[in-house]
């Protein structure tokens, strides 16, 4: 058996012979992956992919017990320690946790505990983060650190004593006199330190680490402790190993507090629960805030709080019965590229996009992924027909990490030939100096660029015309209702003049929908200066740059007058823009080029005659909410989310998306989410919609 398609396996229909072939195949695959993960610090598959294979192995062995081998992965923890390190026998086995992947799994975990203990209630459960690092055990004898080791295979680990001592915050001595006192935890590297470390590796011409977990593992397992000392390692402790004082703590909650008192680093984001609802609520809250953490986590851990109950529950050969890890959905998946198309952006950038067999990653179905540019395709040797690994973090656009070369079919995979001309208007593509992206320079006549600029102009952060989405814009352009941005504001009047094919008569539109659209267009005619500047889609002018330009020019008239002087090579204006922090040479150059095109100037002149562009209203630190960060949550009855954001910005505030220690104020509407709970925990000031409106009006 060379390959295995697990989607076709029905365990209930397996014969013993077929099951044996699959288990034999899985044994070899899992052993290979264990070697790469635990010993080489260079995983070949994602955690999620590994979990799928291991769970399949466990289920088959459960149905066919005679297939269980001495080294069967249903009874295995970790990987055999490397011969490069001296071996350490764990006085108390370092077991791995059983995994749960859905609410039902966690519910079953509680039910099994109740049945085992013969109780009819949920015992108290401590809910903690599952840190994605390298597990370790540290032994103290009479208060002195004498030995530290990795998990290894759960029975025998690797001696990392001298390496662990290089972590500055790790206690070398403890104010206790116990003969043996072992703590267990996780060694990790923060996301920011990981990025810095990889930059250093690149400068030194060394291999880059694939993720923070591998960086931490590779750093603590250095043969030379001096190298480990140069790495920004951190740790959390969360459990005991072997101890001679069995009365140190009676519960997990008490243990975490006492470990903290001993000056160990303990993650303080844990809660005590006694029901499934609050356990799942903890998981959901953590999942929401996951991408805002300084370090990587891959789930949460639930542990029975009472150590006496933990002792009664005991463990299987691989995992304790009193704990379970509720893993986050996979952020990495594998799927097939069916085609590669080209997408032309509002500034002419031509981006290759991979069309994929749809795959669900972290609850989101993904069918497209950007390939960025020609160099990206060539450097990763990405071809049509390839199976690729996708990565998605939070709401970030999915990225193709690499190709599964073992699955490549040479006969069916096809190299993508990047064209020399624009797929929309056939003009020659150019790659500007200092860039890697190919661009179409036919900005005024390229249909794709016209379409994208209109979409940008009406978008949420620009003029925010509700009801005018991409599909409707495509319809209006294709059917000649509009040909440019100005036509949007003439749409209502022009529609009245039509003798046939009025918008309200078109299927999918309707009189109510059309009237609402016209109302929204008219409301959008009143716009603040920075949003107007942003809406123009000048290259290198984003939302922040637009605010800086609005702050500099104050009025629409001055913005246009000064920009025209800039286009006419007035050095004073150019130098002034170049010296504004956050703008610089690139923005000044692009604004100059934009106003050198007469068609752009004509467009702006027409828009100024149609729109009411409000002057910049920033008044420095005298504004009510100057230098404050405000977050909004829930739905609001009297104002839209976009309008309330504008209100905040007019008062000098910075609008955030997540609640953190840097948040000054949370404004809550109906059906407020997890942000409210987080703000309450952090002691952040909270007001409702009515109080907000009163504040704004004052």
Curated annotation (Swiss-Prot):
One Pfam family of this chain: DNA_ligase_ZBD
Cofactors that this protein relies on: Mg(2+); Mn(2+)
Binding site for NAD(+): 47-51, 96-97, 128, 151, 186, 303, 327
Enzyme Commission number, as recorded: 6.5.1.2
Gene3D superfamilies (alphabetical): 5' to 3' exonuclease, C-terminal subdomain, 6.20.10.30, BRCT domain, DNA ligase/mRNA capping enzyme, Helix hairpin bin, Nucleic acid-binding proteins
InterPro entries: BRCT_dom (IPR001357), BRCT_dom_sf (IPR036420), DisA/LigA_HHH (IPR041663), DNA_ligase (IPR001679), DNA_ligase_AS (IPR018239), DNA_ligase_CS (IPR033136), DNAligase_adenylation (IPR013839), DNAligase_N (IPR013840)
Reaction(s) catalysed by this chain's protein: NAD(+) + (deoxyribonucleotide)n-3'-hydroxyl + 5'-phospho-(deoxyribonucleotide)m = (deoxyribonucleotide)n+m + AMP + beta-nicotinamide D-nucleotide
Top-level taxon: Bacteria
Bilayer-crossing regions: none
Residue sites binding Zn(2+) per the record: 422, 425, 440, 446
All residue ranges annotated as the BRCT domain in the record: 620-698
Annotated catalytic residues: 130
Keywords for this protein: DNA damage, DNA repair, DNA replication, Ligase, Magnesium, Manganese, Metal-binding, NAD, Zinc
Swiss-Prot/TrEMBL GO biological process terms: DNA repair; DNA replication
GO terms for MF: DNA binding; DNA ligase (NAD+) activity; metal ion binding
Function, in words: DNA ligase that catalyzes the formation of phosphodiester linkages between 5'-phosphoryl and 3'-hydroxyl groups in double-stranded DNA using NAD as a coenzyme and as the energy source for the reaction. It is essential for DNA replication and repair of damaged DNA.
Record HAMAP family: DNA_ligase_A
Protein name, entry field: DNA ligase
């Amino acid at each position: 058996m060379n390959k295995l398609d697990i989607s076709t396996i029905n365990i209930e229909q397996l014969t013993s012979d077929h099951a044996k072939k699959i288990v034999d195949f899985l044994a070899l695959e899992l052993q290979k992956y264990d070697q790469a993960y635990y010993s080489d610090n260079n995983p070949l598959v994602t955690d999620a992919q590994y979990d799928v294979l291991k769970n399949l192995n466990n289920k088959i062995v459960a149905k066919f017990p005679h297939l269980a081998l001495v080294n069967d992965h249903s009874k295995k923890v970790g990987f055999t320690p490397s011969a490069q390190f001296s071996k350490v026998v764990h006085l108390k086995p370092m077991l791995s946790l059983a995994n749960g992947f859905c609410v039902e799994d966690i519910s079953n975990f509680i039910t099994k505990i109740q049945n085992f203990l013969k109780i009819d209630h949920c015992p108290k459960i401590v809910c903690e983060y599952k840190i994605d690092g390298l597990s370790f055990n540290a032994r103290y004898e009479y208060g002195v650190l004498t030995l530290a080791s990795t998990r290894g295979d759960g029975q025998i680990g690797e001696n990392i004593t001298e390496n662990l001592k290089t972590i500055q915050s790790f206690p070398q001595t403890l104010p206790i006199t116990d003969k043996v006192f072992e703590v267990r935890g996780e060694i990790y590297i923060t996301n920011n330190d990981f990025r810095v470390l990889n930059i250093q590796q690149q400068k030194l011409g060394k291999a880059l680490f694939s993720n923070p977990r591998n960086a931490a593992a590779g750093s603590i397992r250095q043969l030379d402790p001096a190298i480990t000392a140069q790495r920004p390692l951190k740790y959390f402790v969360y459990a005991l190993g072997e101890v001679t004082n069995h009365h140190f703590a009676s519960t997990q909650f008490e243990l975490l507090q006492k470990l903290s008192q001993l000056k160990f680093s303990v993650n303080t984001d844990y809660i005590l629960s006694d029901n499934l609802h609050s356990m799942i609520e903890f998981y959901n809250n953590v999942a929401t805030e996951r991408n805002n953490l300084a370090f990587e986590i891959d789930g949460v851990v639930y542990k029975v709080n009472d150590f006496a109950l933990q002792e009664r529950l005991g463990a299987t050969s691989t995992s304790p019965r009193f704990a379970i890890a509720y893993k986050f959905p996979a952020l990495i998946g594998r799927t097939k590229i069916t085609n590669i198309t080209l997408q032309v952006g509002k500034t002419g950038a031509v981006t290759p996009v991979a069309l994929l067999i749809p795959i669900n990653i972290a609850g989101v179905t993904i069918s497209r992924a950007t390939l960025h540019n020609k160099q990206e395709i060539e450097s990763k040797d990405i071809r049509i027909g390839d199976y690729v690994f996708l990565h998605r973090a939070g709401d970030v656009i999915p990225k193709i990490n690499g190709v599964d070369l073992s699955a490549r079919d040479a006969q069916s995979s096809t190299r993508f030939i990047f064209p020399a001309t624009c797929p929309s208007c056939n003009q020659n593509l150019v790659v500007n100096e200092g860039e890697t992206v190919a661009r179409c320079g036919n900005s005024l006549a390229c249909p794709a660029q016209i379409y994208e600029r209109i979409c940008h102009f009406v978008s949420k952060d620009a003029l925010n015309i509700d009801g005018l989405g991409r599909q409707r814009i495509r319809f209006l352009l294709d059917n000649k209702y509009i040909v440019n941005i100005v036509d949007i504001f003439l749409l209502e009047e022009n529609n009245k003049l039509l003798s046939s094919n009025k918008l309200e008569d078109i299927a999918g539109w309707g009189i109510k929908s059309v009237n609402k659209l016209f109302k929204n267009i008219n409301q959008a005619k009143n716009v603040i200066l920075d949003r107007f500047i942003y809406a123009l889609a000048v290259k290198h002018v984003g939302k922040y740059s637009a605010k800086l330009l609005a702050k500099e020019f104050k009025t629409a008239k001055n913005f246009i007058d000064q920009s025209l002087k800039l286009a006419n090579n007035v050095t004073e204006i150019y130098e002034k823009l170049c010296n504004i922090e956050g703008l610089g040479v690139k923005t000044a150059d692009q604004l100059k080029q934009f106003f050198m095109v007469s068609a752009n100037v004509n467009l702006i002149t027409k828009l100024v005659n149609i729109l009411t562009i409000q002057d910049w209203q920033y008044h420095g630190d005298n504004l009510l909410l100057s230098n404050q960060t405000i977050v909004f949550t829930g739905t609001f009855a009297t104002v839209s989310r976009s309008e309330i954001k504008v209100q905040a910005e007019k008062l000098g505030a910075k609008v955030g998306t997540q609640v953190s220690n840097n948040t000054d104020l949370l404004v809550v509407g109906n059906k407020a989410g997890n942000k409210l709970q987080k703000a309450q925990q952090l002691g952040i000031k909270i007001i409702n919609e009515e109080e907000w409106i009163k504040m704004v009006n004052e």
